Amino acid sequence: MVRRRDATPSYKDIKRTIQCKSATAGCNQQDAIRSYDDSEDTEWKNDGRMSTAWIRYELAEKARVDEVVLKLTGWRKREYPLQIFTDDTLVWEGKTPVSLGYVHLPLAASQPAGSITIKLQGSASDSDKYGNIKELAAPVANELDLFKAKDGDKVRSELRIVECDLLQWIKPN
């Protein structure tokens, strides 16, 4: 018996990506695009001072953003105390959890906005949640996870974003 498969996928999208048209940062402006370029081999970072530990994404369209998805340098062991704003309204505040990659930060109910701002609110701290777990991979696989970042384990007022994705629920939950 041969089963015929439909031409449509077997799933339905429940979220859509809100595109960024540009970004403004507290410093290293030329690298800001690296935080939303869909490459896990690049990053944006500030210069280690609290006054420059922020980045603002201008959206390609005015839209409601329901979730910010971040991959932060040091994801396996570093917690970043952040605030997230839609335009000038605070919609998320807390410490990012350590993870094995991306963290999903659901935002408080928000209205359509033209920008999203992410600000570091204090010193990042280390966690030993994953202890001595080792990954078998080529040495470069861990470079953005603080293993090869020069003095990356010593800087606490540094905000380092590998990837930022802004999502909207197609049907709000």
What are these regions (language model features)?
Residues M1-K62, K71-R78, T86, D126, ...:
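Disordered, acidic Ser/Thr/Pro-rich linker "stalks" and the adjacent N-terminal cap
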Residues E67, S115-T117:
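Short, conserved beta-strand segments of beta-strand-rich sandwich/propeller modules, principally
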Residues K95-L100:
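Short proline/glycine- and polar residue-rich coil/turn motifs
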Residues K119-D128:
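Short beta-strand-plus-loop segments that form exposed binding edges in beta-rich domains
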